[in-house]
């Protein structure tokens, strides 16, 4: 090549490398940074960002690793260690994106109160508000009616004219007879009664006209018949009165004839009833005497059988009295019990007294 060689160029005309810049500032042989984002505590160190001011920063971790590998390879070739620049925005220059470092003293300690708290990685979201219960207004509100310009409001009459005819119509006036109560059942029954009366009246008129047509019956005939009926009724009433008077006379005569016979009949009935009572009393005495003698023999023969039969006889007398009387009579019941005990237990008392 015929061009000028690098060796022949003046030191001010050729470009200066990073190693030369670091060597001039006395950073050759400085220890390498362990982490990419950690700063050195040496105040004499000069970063590449301070030297170049036009190197963009890439936030991609993969790109950072590639850049770090290339930097180490370059250091191995030239024997210099370069301080890694801080991560900045890819669209901003490095000088503009330098983060302010905390002040460090000579011993490498950061004084308290001079370092601000690190900002969070992600921006904070706004706090959640409690949801209100109940109905809420929707985000999409209903369109308001067109009321025209605020400065020139539209009259209500014009708004009413825009409404539909159905909304603007008024109901029909109420008829005056609408409040009158209507009895459907009563009207139907009355209509049926009217029809029945009309039909009956029509039949009666037809019958009367037919009778007058064929028999010649007129109003004079009806009056004559009524007069004749009145005379006949008067005659029958007079005859009835006469008959009643005759019947009364006959009844009094018959009563005078039959009164002695009824007296004899009533006397005979009373005598018959008395004789029946006497006969029943005699039969009762005879029956009681026979039972007394029979129980006397039973008590002598077998007292157990006599005792059972005496109980049965007493119960029989009580039942018989209640059947004959057919009423709740405690006196008759007590008399029956006393008579039964006297007939059945009397022989036992006599035998014990004599023996």
UniProtKB/Swiss-Prot annotation:
Record membrane topology: Multi-pass membrane protein
Residue spans crossing the bilayer: 275-295, 301-321, 330-350
Keyword flag NAD: no
Keyword Protein transport among UniProt keywords: no
Localization terms from the record: Cell membrane
Keywords assigned: Cell membrane, Membrane, Transmembrane, Transmembrane helix
GO cellular component terms given for this protein: plasma membrane
Family designation: To M.tuberculosis Rv0497.
Name of protein: Uncharacterized protein ML2433
